[in-house]
């Protein structure tokens, strides 16, 4: 334990399509399965007229309720509504998105009959809460501390927004780390004993929605990210889409019907395609069978692995480009890469493995760690290190992350002057002296940008501030020191100081555009609590309803049992039967009643049935004898307590 009484620190891989959680325990990492027994949980949140669902339950009902089922929140987090990637993604999502204040994309759903709006951070926080609960259920303690991973590509505002999601979920996010770095840690632990000297490792991470390639060097437990590249919009879902389109065309040819306007049909087809894709990684062909796909028409078809590869060949080939770019950026030849590590479920596709292996001239790929779990595995190790729980096995792992994009400021003529080049190891600090470019200039505007282009207009403005009060002087005379300082979480502080007057000003770039304010986070934390208590209420309701239902049906079965039925006076038997009938009728009409209504109904029913049954047992005491009587009790429904174990299964 971390000695803070907060249970161990967990590692969470918050994925675009699936998330995964791990913890360091008994000197190794445990990847924790959810209540469905799955070691990964869909990053889905659904809202219905009666409840909120997260994870498998949400994904399973997406066909019935596409407009109120939110997924892909990671594609929105820390972005602006007007961002071109948000605009193009919106076309593919069934749920509604509109621009909120400050150009922030807001998600609209209907929940319990009213329209609700959520920021991407809130949706992600719900997934994080789910992951935390999965860990808590397994460990039996409350958990506060977590390490959360993000793509190496994420810029500052996306990292910050992910951190905010953690805060809303009631977590203390100890560190945000890059996914490839996490995978490398998982891998480093596996390989550490044997390695001597520096190793270059290429992490090839092809997940459900994104693709990242990173090149790291590992030496004596020190990890350094040398370069990153990738495509934020390439992944398993794209392969599914190709297959979906293929079958939509086939359905058009066979039945002259176009299903593209029907979200439910498309969703059912997509679910089948996803399953088929997974099957094709281990078999040469598979079938798709969907009853009554559209207007009552059944759809049966087969697809071979070769056809699947042909549909996606251009995408598979595209996966190799970032690998080349990554090597170029790191100024490294592919022959100097010691290991190629596969991460992400889509790396199970044989063709992807083959292309990658060919690129590295037949080199064996590392598949020793389950590709779905490697990132959470590494995050859990990092959590153990940060909370001082790990043993000597992990303590000497040091983690050096890098900045994914160059950071700098605008100088005369809109030129980007870089202070911190991309792929610089962080934490880092750089200073440079600037001056004024006109005589008697009273102040300078410091504009901070991230990006690789030569002109600032092509890069991303992170923030700006004014340093004023510069005493009149000819141009080029004042000495203004600008300092860029990035901490271990990749959060940037920029300060400027006029050397002559000591005038100072600074800015923390936690990307205020689209960044949540303290108040908003506070409000969202309260909302999260509210939703949690509503979920609890709903669970209580379901349990009370099930208890009543179990009691009524058990009682009905009991009095229908001949051994018991014949011992009951007819009037009593009728009285019980009527009260049960009435209760079952009431149940059917009041599925959405409150928990206490169900409990009252239960008490009412018990007050009628229990005395009669008890009287019967006392009366039967003579013939039945001691043991007999207790034997009867097993049939007779005990009060709500007896429904206990059954309830859990229903829920």
UniProtKB/Swiss-Prot annotation:
Residues 619-629 have a biased composition (Gly residues). It is found in: Cytoplasm, Cytosol; Nucleus. Induction: Induced by heat shock and cold. Induced by dehydration stress and abscisic acid (ABA). Up-regulated by viral infection. Expressed at a substantial level during normal growth in root, stem, leaf and flower tissues, but not in siliques. Expressed in cotyledons, leaves, stems, vascular bundles, roots, stigmas and anthers. Its main location: cytoplasm. It holds the Pfam family HSP70. The keyword Nucleus applies. One of its GO terms (molecular function) is mRNA binding. Coiled coil: none annotated. Disulfide bonds: none annotated. SUPFAM superfamilies: Actin-like ATPase domain, Heat shock protein 70kD (HSP70), C-terminal subdomain, Heat shock protein 70kD (HSP70), peptide-binding domain. One of its GO terms (cellular component) is plant-type vacuole. InterPro entries: ATPase_NBD, Heat_shock_70_CS, HSP70_C_sf, HSP70_peptide-bd_sf, Hsp_70_fam. The modification N-acetylserine is found at residue 2. Binds to the deubiquitinating enzyme AMSH3. Interacts with SGT1B (via SGS domain). Interacts with OEP61. Interacts with HSFA1A/HSF1. Interacts with BAG3, BAG4 and BAG5. Interacts with WPP1, WPP2 and WIT1. Component of a ternary complex composed of WPP1, HSP70-1 and WIT1. Binds to TIR. Plants overexpressing HSP70-1 show disabled immune responses, enhanced tolerance to heat shock and altered plant growth and development. Plants overexpressing HSP70-1 are hypersensitive to abscisic acid (ABA) in seed germination assays, and are compromised in the dark- and ABA-induced stomatal closure. NCBIfam families: PRK00290.1. This is Heat shock 70 kDa protein 1. It comes from Arabidopsis thaliana.
